[in-house]
Curated annotation (Swiss-Prot):
It comes from the Bacteria. Belongs to the HscB family. The gene is hscB. This is Co-chaperone protein HscB homolog. Keywords: Chaperone. Signal peptide: none annotated. NCBIfam families: hscB (TIGR00714), PRK05014.1 (NF003449). SMART domains: DnaJ (SM00271).
Amino acid sequence: MNHFELFGLPNQFELDGGLLSAQFLELQKRFHPDNFATSSERDRLLSVQKAAQINDAYQTLKNPVTRAEYILSEQGHDIRGEQTTMQDPMFLMQQMELREDLEDLLSSSDPESALFDFSENVSAMRKTQLAELKQQLESELWQEAAQSVRKLKFIDKLNQEVEKLEDKLLG
């Protein structure tokens, strides 16, 4: 049983987050190890394993990047944990420039406003890349989708750097 089947969801990238959360809570309640406290050792062990499977599946499906990685792995294109280098030099150059711009924000006349604008730009990039990824997965363009996932990981790392700088400025 794959992660989508576990939650009774269609096996597709686009999913209803509210339904995923509701199904997660229901399954978590049903298979919670406390419900099996008086059961046999075997049943207690099975409930712990099932609870772990439910938690793992939920963590995977709730994040679009890990959900896409999971879909790709189900199609024989497992890129989770890979160390493949990005093959798109223009994208890499853009990422380097964005990181330089982020560093330069601290010395701007209004760093908070500049950071807000920068963050909006990164969010727009992420949204665009997610839309591309959705199309690629729907069209079963697995290699292109894998490349989009790699790009999203770069964008997400950049977003984390934005959040760190935000904490530094506002903290």
